[in-house]
Amino acid sequence: MANISSPFGQNEWLVEEMYRKFRDDPSSVDPSWHEFLVDYSPEPTSQPAAEPTRVTSPLVAERAAAAAPQAPPKPADTAAAGNGVVAALAAKTAVPPPAEGDEVAVLRGAAAAVVKNMSASLEVPTATSVRAVPAKLLIDNRIVINNQLKRTRGGKISFTHLLGYALVQAVKKFPNMNRHYTEVDGKPTAVTPAHTNLGLAIDLQGKDGKRSLVVAGIKRCETMRFAQFVTAYEDIVRRARDGKLTTEDFAGVTISLTNPGTIGTVHSVPRLMPGQGAIIGVGAMEYPAEFQGASEERIAELGIGKLITLTSTYDHRIIQGAESGDFLRTIHELLLSDGFWDEVFRELSIPYLPVRWSTDNPDSIVDKNARVMNLIAAYRNRGHLMADTDPLRLDKARFRSHPDLEVLTHGLTLWDLDRVFKVDGFAGAQYKKLRDVLGLLRDAYCRHIGVEYAHILDPEQKEWLEQRVETKHVKPTVAQQKYILSKLNAAEAFETFLQTKYVGQKRFSLEGAESVIPMMDAAIDQCAEHGLDEVVIGMPHRGRLNVLANIVGKPYSQIFTEFEGNLNPSQAHGSGDVKYHLGATGLYLQMFGDNDIQVSLTANPSHLEAVDPVLEGLVRAKQDLLDHGSIDSDGQRAFSVVPLMLHGDAAFAGQGVVAETLNLANLPGYRVGGTIHIIVNNQIGFTTAPEYSRSSEYCTDVAKMIGAPIFHVNGDDPEACVWVARLAVDFRQRFKKDVVIDMLCYRRRGHNEGDDPSMTNPYVYDVVDTKRGARKSYTEALIGRGDISMKEAEDALRDYQGQLERVFNEVRELEKHGVQPSESVESDQMIPAGLATAVDKSLLARIGDAFLALPNGFTAHPRVQPVLEKRREMAYEGKIDWAFGELLALGSLVAEGKLVRLSGQDSRRGTFSQRHSVLIDRHTGEEFTPLQLLATNSDGSPTGGKFLVYDSPLSEYAAVGFEYGYTVGNPDAVVLWEAQFGDFVNGAQSIIDEFISSGEAKWGQLSNVVLLLPHGHEGQGPDHTSARIERFLQLWAEGSMTIAMPSTPSNYFHLLRRHALDGIQRPLIVFTPKSMLRHKAAVSEIKDFTEIKFRSVLEEPTYEDGIGDRNKVSRILLTSGKLYYELAARKAKDNRNDLAIVRLEQLAPLPRRRLRETLDRYENVKEFFWVQEEPANQGAWPRFGLELPELLPDKLAGIKRISRRAMSAPSSGSSKVHAVEQQEILDEAFG
């Protein structure tokens, strides 16, 4: 008889077996059992087990023996102890002895325990309740759950997980189902345990193939949430199969669950063991018997679902039938309820709403076809709103849902899931089950990638995206997964290394966004796969060091040297910059291919997004040099240099230059064939949350203006990040358009390593502090899915850490250099002596002829035709005006093989209708660019030069940044940007401050960009007057740029040519005229272009020609620009020979030698004045007032200023006031 009082119940056999092993060899038993087994006393058995025996008589004898009469067995041998009725029945049943040849075996171990337990169960008076429960919702939601788990961390949820948890919840409502019967002092007693300990019947198969059953308990189930319950369930099952269950696992089971349905049993009445009040049985899921012969289509049409039979076998002494029936009804209701499934989905971090129970909708199939198509359209348009893209999931109770994406909204129910509908080519099919449609839609638009493309107007692009996105997910190969993991290892290990070795140093780490490294790697790899020439990266400071090390390939030793502050003074001219602003260049080699590609990272300042237009210009210049461009018909080499731009989320939404740069994307003068944008979306800007920093749903909404597809991706899913990166490159190559990837992640630390973000975002950083990084979560997913082993993951990380440690130790041993003051970069580039800028007369004539060499049938505008004729006349006869002098300079450079690029607002015609560099046919709109004719020699051979002139968008910041970048990408090009009025250049002040004036000193980045800034006081008001000379002079130092305000067309001509030919890569700032464009005196003769060069200091022509007498001069007026002509006119009017006007044509660097030589010619001068139109606090005086006395102390120590009074605005808003002020300047100058 079984030991009913044993705490192990039907598991007692296992305990006895372990005891025997322990007795023979204690080390063969898990140590956790030792304490229990030391004093364990097994129940005595009737006899030792015997090996099976077989009767050996012949077959005839077997039959005879079977027929022979047998002595009836004694009642004591056959009756089960306990119930008298059972014993009497047993006594009446004669059990014949084994026949000859039968196999006879004494039962032992598990088999013997079954005998005991089953005999003991006969003493429990039981009854059984049965309930059939619809299984469709259970099936459908389990599919949703496991599909999500398959794509993320791996693992599966079984039906028994769900049914067991529902059972536990039902017990909370019916605690009587958890109690058991016993006798206390001989009195019948019902015991209600404090906790629900659910026993799981676990079928085990031994090494010999024999099967056995154990019942192990999940303790205190009522305290668990679903995820905890699943973890405990899996732990019990795993330990049971590994033979590692402990005594505690067997004791104290209060209610059991058995699932014979796993082997196809539909309806089971299990036996109830003493010590429990109920055992719940689960049958197989089957269609009702009468429908099992029907086809799937017919079953779906009728709305027939599978059923699962639940049985509750209970101790009738303490549980009544009504309680048992209500208990099953509660489980039934739970399995169909919204609340139960909501909790399950939340606990498993399934971000979507569960399938909801509802009755079938009998609408016609035609109507539902339309509804299914509407559902498909809804997912394509709105699916991104339901995508699981936020790795933090700050609102864990919130499901990713949208009414437009729910099947119920479209009049569809779970009964439609297995019905077939017409889908009109969706995923390459005409008909599909709704379940398959939903599965594809969820995978395409609502997993870890959200796709926005409904704003794209081109149907071909939308169809291409649909075909690429709406496909079955293909998991990367194991080799690819290991490679992705290696990149994550590298990204995380690099940051951890720096954090450990350089505590407290700012580095703006990538922690929390490590997946951007495999993402960038994949994008570059795909560019290499397409056979492209180069990827140029522009990015802010966050993560920059990581990108330099793990993407560009900058040597670790160099990065660590910069952290040490150990710079070699022989290599460090200029101010330098912080390590997270520097650029680098490297070569990328494909891991799974044979191609390579150049990779470079351009330098940038801390001004967020300022590098964006610079990068675009740099790339366009490289493309123009390669001359692949859009003329490549097959598209493979077209735009073969790819800009890869990284952004922050707050900056992408907040900085206006982003929109300005995006606006360049499809413009002829600026197009680069598509930029790959990656937004490292930390979901915070310094300390500002998104709801305070943007008004749009996404930080990427601004990109919709150019029809760029937008991919939102979860940064905790590196495989998704890699897939999106490759898709982005493919789209860019196919359509030559921008693509935006919004990688949602988080910032592990504050804005910098010394910042504590929890002060302003406490809840967010409570979540972040406990968040496992992308590397760990991806490693766990790979191991959970069985793709790699833990050892493989650990070995890869150790290898990388060891590499960093070795380099770190090497850097510590490098030569140490003492800290020295930085040296100027001024002497790094010197103007060559004897540089000739004059040209032959024949070239002037050829340029003049070009303006009348109109194509056949071309009709110039009647107001432009006289301009063209006048230009030809000037080329031969002289009196060359400013506009033509400029075109002569540019045309001559084209003829000499230079690429000349001129852009700006209205620059093709010119703000003041002066340039007319591109002619438009009056009738057809055809365009003709005369200077492009200079790109061909007279014999028809190409010179190698080009004249590219573009009207820019109405932008300064991006436009100037682009032109600066162009000069970095093509140092030999002559690149000019013209402001509409010089006043508006301050819209590009960040570019001027951070790149143009200081790029060489900070980064060694050279540029020869030319800014043409119309300037002059002419009564047009404060915003059409000043290009802010004072600001450029304040920025000038170390020869960082040339600043000039020429006053003659010929000097402007020579200035441009000197700049293009001197080999110096430094910017040129030219303050150009407005009214002087048509001033009759502001002209130059042909000899001024063919015989001389640029002169930084000009005297009046009378003195230069030897007509005027310098000895009569007692006062010198130093001035610059168009004011000279007003002063000269007044001098002529007043006949003042005691006064001379000297022009400073170059404002910086100040031409000290030329100025001294000029002033030394006037021996009797007693007064020096600086005369300017600008207010006293503006123009050149704020610098010249300090610098001129220091430059020439013997002459200019007492120099005085004549100007407008100090003003906050550049000028008066009244033209009449302007005239009065201008007159006062002249009066004072000649007073």
From Swiss-Prot:
2-oxoglutarate binds at H581, S606, H1024. GO terms for biological process: 2-oxoglutarate metabolic process; succinate metabolic process; tricarboxylic acid cycle. Its EC number is 2.2.1.5, 4.1.1.71, 1.2.4.2, 2.3.1.61. Mg(2+) binds at D649, N682, I684. Residues 38-79 are annotated as: Disordered. Residues 338-1231 are annotated as: 2-oxoglutarate dehydrogenase E1, C-terminal part. Thiamine diphosphate binds at R542, S606, L608, D649, A650, A651, N682. The keyword tRNA-binding does not apply. Residues 42-88 are annotated as: Linker. Residues 787-817 form a coiled coil. Its cofactor is Mg(2+); thiamine diphosphate. Disruption phenotype: Attempts to disrupt Rv1248c in M.tuberculosis H37Rv and Erdman strains by homologous recombination were unsuccessful, raising the possibility that Rv1248c may be essential. However, deletion mutants were readily obtained in a strain derived from H37Rv in PubMed:19936047. The mutant strain grows as well as wild-type in medium containing both carbohydrates (dextrose and glycerol) and fatty acids, under a CO(2) enriched atmosphere, but shows a marked growth defect when grown in medium containing carbohydrates as the sole carbon source in the presence of CO(2). Residues 58-69 have a biased composition (Low complexity). It catalyses: glyoxylate + 2-oxoglutarate + H(+) = 2-hydroxy-3-oxoadipate + CO2; 2-oxoglutarate + H(+) = succinate semialdehyde + CO2; N(6)-[(R)-lipoyl]-L-lysyl-[protein] + 2-oxoglutarate + H(+) = N(6)-[(R)-S(8)-succinyldihydrolipoyl]-L-lysyl-[protein] + CO2; N(6)-[(R)-dihydrolipoyl]-L-lysyl-[protein] + succinyl-CoA = N(6)-[(R)-S(8)-succinyldihydrolipoyl]-L-lysyl-[protein] + CoA. SMART domains: Transket_pyr. CDD domains: TPP_E1_OGDC_like. Residues 1-41 are annotated as: 2-oxoglutarate dehydrogenase E1, N-terminal part. Alpha-ketoglutarate dehydrogenase and decarboxylase activities are inhibited by unphosphorylated GarA, and allosterically activated by acetyl-CoA, the main substrate of the TCA cycle. Acetyl-CoA binds at T1042, R1058, K1093, S1096, Q1146, R1153, R1154. NCBIfam families: 2oxo_dh_E1 (TIGR00239), PRK09404.1 (NF006914), PRK12270.1 (NF008907). This is Multifunctional 2-oxoglutarate metabolism enzyme. It comes from Mycobacterium tuberculosis (strain ATCC 25618 / H37Rv).
